[in-house]
Amino acid sequence: MTKGAALQSFFDSIMTSYAASAVPDNATLPYLTYDFITSAWDGGEVGLTVNMWFRTTSEKEPNAAVDKLSKAIGLGGVQIPCDDGVIWLKRGSPWAQSLTDATDKTIKRRYINVTAEYLTLN
């Protein structure tokens, strides 16, 4: 599985997800977007931004989704198999920030920092 497919599969296990550059015009909330940034062995940690988008007046659904992602990554991170190795995802710092849309108070966003270490040959 390619790096892109591995990340897509992982984030899809949390909720409907799209690479930030590939959100379709007909996408409906809730969904998450993630930065698709790659590296390889010895490239160090790479920062990935995850944004979760919701249409709700409550904080319950956004907070539950952040918690689901946090548990999926775990305390020591999670290693996702891909071609030629694994992607080691870890919680970034700060972990999650709550944001609202200035034009629509029912749109809630969670801005989440994730780090990825590509333990891959290429």
Label each PLM-derived region with a short phrase.
Residues M1-Y18, N26, T33-N122:
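Charged, amphipathic alpha-helical segments and their flanking helix caps
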